[in-house]
């Protein structure tokens, strides 16, 4: 690890006698794929973003307790997320366990104190020798910063970036917070319509007509869909549509995520065509998925024709509404063959819950997680017909009687 910033310190208790490898294995195993590869602990260690996990353990009276230290050079938000992930571990081996965060030590704090004290000394000496006017310096710095601040555009005083007048291209977003976040990463040719009120400001309509390229950059939720509908109904010139990841908002994206979303923008006509396809019957999606599987797995014609009953199944409207709410919740929903709710569970518990269900009780599983080989095989043994997840993991062999889709297949990108 090249630069240590923080040390995550936790304590734990286990209702049984365990060893250090058991604790470390539980941490790796139960945090795997919670937030995708980006926050996989092993990968973070390989990249030098996390250090070696230190475990001290004491077994007494058939129980174990101890503490854990995890060095981190991630930022504050990412480090807090790692701490929360480790706290979510509930079992070590077959025994119930409880992990609790005690503190996140900022190892740079002492160094920062010394730097601040030294800076005070330098400033005192400098002021004494040069008679420096600090206010003058601060005003100069403040003036430079203001060039990247928000401006107000049009008679509606809409939040906008400073290049909204001069840049030949334009990015339209929903609100003020989106503009601020884009400015943070250097995107200054922006204007906000301020919410899905059903009425787009006329100044945005006129502004779009004079731009070479106009991008609607919207949240990855139903609110983003509403904004796009309002823009189209108001005859705003839109050339491309870019969306934040499903369930995410533009205001919370990192610079890397913003760049990726904008690079994935597609022409408006193509986007609308995709939307129409996404609201078509689920049967057509499953049929398409079956055709792809036929080519990928070189299935025989007889195997493709067998799930005819499954292909005809459609997702009811009320279930579609539940699906749209799933992204970002880390929850899963299990339905029976008539789309009646069987149970709502946390993603981390979905394997255990499915194992305990009677065969035939679960026909459809929709969850905010990764579809894995283990889940797929268990679902096949429980006669599950359809699984919908955030994404599909490394699947080596797909059971013929289970169809798999992503949330994007069902509710659009």
Curated annotation (Swiss-Prot):
Catalytic activity: ssDNA + n NTP = ssDNA/pppN(pN)n-1 hybrid + (n-1) diphosphate
GO CC list: cytoplasm; DNA-directed RNA polymerase complex; exosome (RNase complex); primosome complex
Matching SUPFAM superfamilies: Toprim domain
CDD domains: TOPRIM_primases
EC number of the protein: 2.7.7.101
Binding sites annotated in the UniProt record for Mg(2+) 1: 174, 219
Protein transport as UniProt keyword: no
Family per record: Belongs to the archaeal DnaG primase family.
Function: RNA polymerase that catalyzes the synthesis of short RNA molecules used as primers for DNA polymerase during DNA replication. Also part of the exosome, which is a complex involved in RNA degradation. Acts as a poly(A)-binding protein that enhances the interaction between heteromeric, adenine-rich transcripts and the exosome.
Designated name of the protein: DNA primase DnaG
UniProt source species: Metallosphaera sedula (strain ATCC 51363 / DSM 5348 / JCM 9185 / NBRC 15509 / TH2)
């Amino acid at each position: 690890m090249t630069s240590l910033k923080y040390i995550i310190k936790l304590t734990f208790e286990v209702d049984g006698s365990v060893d250090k490898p058991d604790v470390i294995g539980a941490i790796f195993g139960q945090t795997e794929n919670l937030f995708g590869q980006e926050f996989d602990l092993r990968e973070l260690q390989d990249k030098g973003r996390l250090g070696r996990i230190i475990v001290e353990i004491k077994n007494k009276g058939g129980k174990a307790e101890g503490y854990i230290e995890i060095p981190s050079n991630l930022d504050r938000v990412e480090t807090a997320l790692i701490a929360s992930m480790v706290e979510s571990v509930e079992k070590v081996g077959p025994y119930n366990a409880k992990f609790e965060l005690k503190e996140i030590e900022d190892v740079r704090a002492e160094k920062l104190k010394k730097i601040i004290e030294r800076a005070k000394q330098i400033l005192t000496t400098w002021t004494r020798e040069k008679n420096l006017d600090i206010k003058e310096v601060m005003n100069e710095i403040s003036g430079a910063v203001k060039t990247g601040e928000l401006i107000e555009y049009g008679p509606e005083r809409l939040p906008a970036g400073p290049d909204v007048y001069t840049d030949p291209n334009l990015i339209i977003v929903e609100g003020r917070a989106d503009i601020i976040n884009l400015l943070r990463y250097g995107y200054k040719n922006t204007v906000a319509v301020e919410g899905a009120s059903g009425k787009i400001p006329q100044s945005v309509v006129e502004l779009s007509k004079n731009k070479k390229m106009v991008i609607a950059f919207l949240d990855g939720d139903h609110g983003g869909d509403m904004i796009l509908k309002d823009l189209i109904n108001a005859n705003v010139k839109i050339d491309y549509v870019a969306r934040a990841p499903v369930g995410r908002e533009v205001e919370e994206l990192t610079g890397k995520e913003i760049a990726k979303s904008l690079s994935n923008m597609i022409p408006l006509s193509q986007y609308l065509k995709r939307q129409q396809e996404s609201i078509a019957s689920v049967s057509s999606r499953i049929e398409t998925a079956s055709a792809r599987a036929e080519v990928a797995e070189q299935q025989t014609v007889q195997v493709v024709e067998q799930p005819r009953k499954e292909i005809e199944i459609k997702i009811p409207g009320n279930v579609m509404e539940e699906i749209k709410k799933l992204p970002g919740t880390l929850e899963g929903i299990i339905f029976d063959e008539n789309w009646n709710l069987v149970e709502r569970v946390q993603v981390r518990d979905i394997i255990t819950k499915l194992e305990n269900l009677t065969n035939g009780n679960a026909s459809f599983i929709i969850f905010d997680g990764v579809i894995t080989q283990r889940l797929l095989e268990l679902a096949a043994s429980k006669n599950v017909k359809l699984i919908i997840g955030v994404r599909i993991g490394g699947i080596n062999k797909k059971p013929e009687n289970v169809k798999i889709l992503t949330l994007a297949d069902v509710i659009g990108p």
